[in-house]
UniProtKB/Swiss-Prot annotation:
Family to which the UniProt record says this protein belongs: Belongs to the complex I subunit 1 family.
EC number, UniProt record: 7.1.1.-
GO cellular component, one term: plasma membrane
Organism the protein comes from: Rhizobium meliloti (strain 1021)
Keyword Cell membrane: yes
Transmembrane regions listed in the UniProt entry: 3-23, 77-97, 119-139, 165-185, 191-211, 250-270, 272-292, 307-327
UniProt subunit comment: NDH-1 is composed of 14 different subunits. Subunits NuoA, H, J, K, L, M, N constitute the membrane sector of the complex.
PROSITE patterns per the UniProt record, alphabetical: COMPLEX1_ND1_1 (PS00667)
Protein known as: NADH-quinone oxidoreductase subunit H 2
InterPro entries, per the entry: NADH_UbQ_OxRdtase_su1/FPO, NADH_UbQ_OxRdtase_su1_CS
UniProt record, GO biological process: aerobic respiration
Catalyzed reaction equations: a quinone + NADH + 5 H(+)(in) = a quinol + NAD(+) + 4 H(+)(out)
Membrane topology field: Multi-pass membrane protein
Any GO molecular function: NADH dehydrogenase activity
Amino acid sequence: MELIVALGVIVFKVALVIAILLLLPLPLTWLERKIAGHMQQRMGPMRVGWHGLLQPVADGIKLLTKEDHIPAEADRFLFKLAPILALAPPFVVFAAIPFGESVSVLGNEITLYISNLNVALLFVFAVIGLEVYGVIFGGWAANSKYAVLGSLRTCAQMISYEIPMGFAVIGVVMLAQSMSLLDIVRAQTDVWNVVYQPIGFFVFFVAGLAEAQRIPFDLAEAEGDLGAGFHTEYSGIRFALFMVSEYVVMVLVSVLTVILFFGGWNGVLIPLPPLLWFLLKVAFFVYLFMWFRFTFPRYRYDQLMAIGWKVLLPLSLANIIISGVVFS
């Protein structure tokens, strides 16, 4: 009986996380448009619903009812598979993400995570790296020069940024002496890691912008020179899946930043519930992603490569050496 209850709890957690992640782009697209309107001294969406709150629903209905166009020369199987490959990895990663310790429900302790892996950090980097295959297959299968160029840029961008991103968290692992995300958060009960690892945080967050393919590092879908990059030929529900994937990765990078460098659900000064602290921190970094989009220009391709190899990689290596000397 206990086994059945435990399995039921796990299934409920998985279903809840999937439902939240699928619905999350709706409020985020509305928020991003409102932020854009505020920064450009206009009102943003106002027509559909009160202050445009139903605009994302209208956009979703529009995408679901549009023609699912497949180019005549495309590889149909890979073209259909690519959006799923882009969407699945960030969803799987959330299975190892803790949102808190536990809560009491009807006298039972319910943990706020699906799985507590001892090597959760390694699992996160291994799985999130698979997302790039969806982008590569989507661009190549479309048989379009703009889409292929977008895919090639994604390959180069991933190599340039995932290496320093991985190196940036080694200092955090040294401090916590564990690769478990729960242990990393518990190690920040008194002092957040960003105090000891400012260089690691800088490298991780900048590389995270590239990982999420957000401005100023959205070279794979640069509208000015590639139309829409790897998803130029996509429409309807398949295009929507790529958009959901982009927003989920943005939230994932924000969550990882909070867990690794900003104490997770550990608060300061103000006595708020741990889960609320966690959500407020994540919301701040999500807002920062959106603020960057309407503040910074897009880097050129050669500039993006130079930042990855000549700036972030040396900084991440220097951070490892400094951390090893200071915390050994």
